[in-house]
Amino acid sequence: MAAWLVRMSAYAELHCLSNFSFQRGASSATELFARAARLGYRALAITDECSLAGIVRAWQAAREHQVQLIVGSEIRLEQGPKLVLLAEDLEGYQNLCRLITRGRRQADKGHYRLLREDLQQPLAGLLAIWLPNDHGDEQAAWLRERFPQRLWLGVELHRGADDDARLDKLLALASHLRLPPVACGDVHMHARGRRALQDCMTAIRNHLPVSEAGAYLFPNGERHLRTLEALQGIYPQALLAETLKIAERCRFDLEQLKYQYPRELVPAGHDPASWLRHLTEQGIARRWPNGASAKVRKQIERELELIAELGYESYFLTVQDIVAFARGRKILCQGRGSAANSAVCFALGITELDPDRTNLLFERFLSRERNEPPDIDVDFEHERREEVIQYVFTRYGRQRAALTAVVSTYHGAGAVRDVAKALGLPPEQVDVLANCCGRWSDQAPSAERLEEAGFDPQSPILRRVLALTDELIGFPRHLSQHPGGFVISEQPLDTLVPVENASMAERTVIQWDKDDLDAVGLLKVDVLALGMLSALRRSFDLIHALRGGKRLSIASIPSEDPATYEMISRADTIGVFQIESRAQMAMLPRLRPQKFYDLVIQVAIVRPGPIQGDMVHPYLRRRNGEEPVAYPSAELEEVFERTLGVPLFQEQVMELAIVAADYTPGEADELRRSMAAWKRHGGLEHHRERLTRGMLAKGYEADFAARIFEQIKGFGSYGFPESHAASFALLTYASSWLKRHEPAAFACALINSWPMGFYSPDQLLQDARRHALQTRPVDVRHSGWDCSLESFGQAQPAIRLGLRMIRGFREEDARRIEQVREAEPFLDVHDLGRRARLDARALELLADAGALRGLAGHRHKARWAVASVEPQLPLFAEGTAIEESTVSLPLPSRGEELLSDYALLGTTLGPHPLKLLRGQLKARRCRDSRELAKLGHGRPIRVAGLVVGRQRPQTASGITFITLEDEFGMVNVVVRHDLAERQRRPFLESRLLQVEGILESSGEVRHVIAGRLHDLTPLLTGLDVRSRDFH
């Protein structure tokens, strides 16, 4: 034994599941590899079941802790054996990816199905560990044929009462079948202490409480990484030594993956570099008809040289091809993010930021030192993005194109709900407990909140629920589909990563998260959806149909229009892109944008980075002349002049590091990435010494260097790229101009593009009416599916509500109404039902929505008329209506009309609900929104209104903005975190809210700082008014 103790200096665990096995493994790869390193393991195989979803994270953890990673997967064949497959080399890895892909593609999302015939494919490079059941001889013969000289019999012992007998039986079987036995741990957790969580996850996975899951639970906590000494006491020496022989054979590393971008876009006679240059030159001629400036030419040459050096030409060509397809289909699109720093992207038509008008920092997008590929995000109209997605699938085929996965992780409410169910709490308690987490929380509920909900925080069962919830938060829950991140490859994707079915038909998704792609050098194209692009395109269509002439576009909108900036400065921005939130609207009268770059700052300044870095107030004071503008040096003046000496953008931090601390551009980008990750992973402190040393060497004071570093930390993961803000500001200006000069078309387009933005159609229509726009009701004689414009010579046309406004009404019914109405107007309800082939449900919806007023009278009459319409059967399709005697029916009351409007349309063109309640609100001494302008700062006030939105910006103060609406306008309410905690029910659930507080007034900006909340929802008596909540 003593000799063996000397020899037993290492071990390789060959069967281990991480938490990426989704509710099986109870430890992360980081935890597993950290413990494996402490215990002296030589290697650790991550073998999640039919999945490589967590293998990139495992690879990173293995490198961090210097323990060899063996890439593998556990699989179970239908009516066949259970195997652990390990990749010996690159060929084995590729075969494993193909096998997992086949299993996943043959089953619904979240499942897999593998049969024996699926293992008939070549399996070279894969080692197999067989975990035998009762059909040993037959299975072994078949497996030996599939894995010649690459098959072992796995022996898994977990200190069970029958371990000795089990070991003897398995060794006898191995000898009989002439298979080498090997020790395996079937590891599900890094340490024994995770057993309770592992049991809980098993119960969750099987939809049972732990108390009823005994058949599925492990009998003890031995499925953890055990010490070498413990393993020696369990397994014979030969079985442990065999693990190291297998580990020695498994030399595959993810670094061996060679990813190539598609090359078929390059025509004959060109290579990717020459074709990219050709397209760029074409773009230069189009973008600058009179020739590009020397500055732009120099920038483009520098970019093309670096793109060629790093081998990314095909990537740029692919994005350009996708954008060209969209533009050819007249789908509005625009690149954003760091790609807007690229003059080549502008020339190719991918982005819209003219490098002649902006200060580009290309290294924010691409640099030699940066160990990650470029990332180009392109927004498309949200209603037409699917056309672009299907184009990509058609162009490259399912084998070479797939969407990126997003790892959905457990958050507070979901974790506490699943744990509480598993521990057997009654359903009603589970719901209350989950609600205690709050919709914005990523933590288990606090003791105070539990007490408020009627729980005893010291209860043993509750303490157990909370302890397990804390462990479960952050664990992967399932793979979901990225909104539009594509991976496209020259070779079949399943030679790089497994591919599985997405939840949506006609889509496939790789098993890796978008963040994993950068680590292994895979390039992603983001085909994203943006509702504002749909709204802008609809606006242009409506204006062109109404006024004729040359079609308006984003590029042709008059620039730097004073009337537009005057409207923005008044915070009259409901519906406007990026500056419609209450936080943005509160800032607008203070910043008062007067030119385009002011909008770039406005978009970026109401963000957690500038706020937490204490940059907002200094900038505003300097802008308003309340504080002198000072620069620590002339060279930094060039960096910060555009933001009055205050760093607001990521690019400025990078430029500061380059100019003031002698960072290379690539080092500066590494600083940016460290900023983005430090709150989650640390890693920023080493820049403190580097930055300080560099700044001191350049003559800057130590306290200035310390202050700059603290501001960088304040940016944290929230620092906003200037290029991103500028791309968004283009859309901000375009939507602002439309709201100012074509308000009817803009409002109509917003409603037709909904859901999008902060405001519901009801709030958009209320805003339109406050701007004196005429709105007309839904009417089958005039309405189409979409809302439309009707003009009779007025400066601004009226908005006719479309049939899409009627909740539950089918688009196909609306299209038939439009089609048959073009031939001949409807005579009455019977004629409508017959010619448009409407069933009783559709006619009843039209009657209840008031859409039959022109054919049958008010709602009561219309409902009576609908009741007399015979069902539309083919035999009677051309028959006549049954004559009904005239019946006298009373007019609906105003209250009835209001209730019906909101129930069917979600809005009303009649009196605002609060106009009907104003008498009761006056009795409660509630002021209306008009009166706020006449009251002084600091005055106690009481207001009430419909809750139309809750917004919680990611700021240090934890406040929430609640927007109230009455018949005259909006009231902005600021709710502190402590008040929201104390009055959670009215804060979260009220639809009609009364607020007692203090009026805060600064210039034209007014808020009510809430001191007490009262839920007046019962006054609405069934009115269905819904808020739009954001965080």
Swiss-Prot record:
Its main location: cytoplasm. It is an enzyme of class 2 (transferase). The keyword DNA damage applies. Belongs to the DNA polymerase type-C family. DnaE2 subfamily. It is found in: Cytoplasm. Its EC number is 2.7.7.7. GO terms for molecular function: 3'-5' exonuclease activity; DNA-directed DNA polymerase activity; nucleic acid binding. GO terms for cellular component: cytoplasm. Keywords: Cytoplasm, DNA damage, DNA repair, DNA replication, DNA-directed DNA polymerase, Nucleotidyltransferase, Transferase. DNA polymerase involved in damage-induced mutagenesis and translesion synthesis (TLS). It is not the major replicative DNA polymerase. GO terms for biological process: DNA repair; DNA replication. It catalyses: DNA(n) + a 2'-deoxyribonucleoside 5'-triphosphate = DNA(n+1) + diphosphate. NCBIfam families: polc, PRK05672.1. It holds the Pfam family PHP. This is Error-prone DNA polymerase.
